[in-house]
Swiss-Prot record:
Transmembrane segments: none annotated. HAMAP family: UPF0301. SUPFAM superfamilies: VC0467-like. Belongs to the UPF0301 (AlgH) family. InterPro entries: AlgH-like. GO terms for cellular component: cytosol. This is UPF0301 protein NE1668.
Length: 186
């Protein structure tokens, strides 16, 4: 099988995907290699706001720029841990660069910077992440569980969580309502 790298791509869940957690999700792939893949679901908001998350962590927001943003449920792995997808990459303690401008940070220094109004210009904060073991994502792709498309930062950072999946589908020229898990023959 030919090696593919889906870092900085969107995964769009197909209607037939059997995992209920990922039904109707848009996942941003932060890293994909022969060791596996790591991503964040970017269209599953929680009831928790960034402001409330910061307060729960003992950080007192000095401004309101991002305080009303919803915290996302990034995936079923480590749901008690926070992950910040942001632009620009910056120089935070634990950052994984997905491309030249987008990073994923898991250290508390970025959250303190957000509370101090010194955080990244554009960001999403998620609890948990989505992970795949070596070869697992490739197997799911072969089973038609996902559509893939190169990611666009405008979709991540300028649209609401509800608008992200339809916008990613539009990149492929597809309306989600027209997708089916059934195959027919003429």
């Amino acid at each position: 099988m030919q090696s593919i790298n889906l870092t900085d791509h969107f995964l769009i869940a197909m209607p037939g995907l059997e995992d209920s957690f990922f039904a109707r999700t848009l996942t941003y792939i932060c890293e994909h290699s022969e060791r596996g893949a790591l991503g964040l679901v970017v269209n599953r908001p929680t009831d928790l706001s960034v402001e409330n998350l910061l307060l729960q962590l003992g950080m007192f927001p000095k401004g309101t720029a991002s305080s009303n943003l919803p915290v996302l449920l990034g995936g079923p792995v480590q749901i008690d841990s926070g992950f910040v997808l942001h632009e620009p990459v910056g120089s935070w303690k634990f950052t994984l660069s997905s491309n030249e401008s987008i990073g994923l940070t898991s250290s508390a220094d970025i959250l303190q910077a957000v509370a101090d109004c010194e955080g990244p210009k554009r960001m999403l904060i998620a609890l948990g992440y989505s992970g795949w073991a070596a070869g697992q994502l490739e197997q799911e792709l072969a089973q038609n569980a996902w559509l893939t498309v190169p990611a666009e930062s405008q979709i991540l950072f300028e649209l609401s969580s509800e608008e992200r999946l339809p916008a990613a589908m539009k990149l492929l020229g597809i309306d989600f309502c027209n997708l089916s898990s059934e195959v027919g023959h003429a």
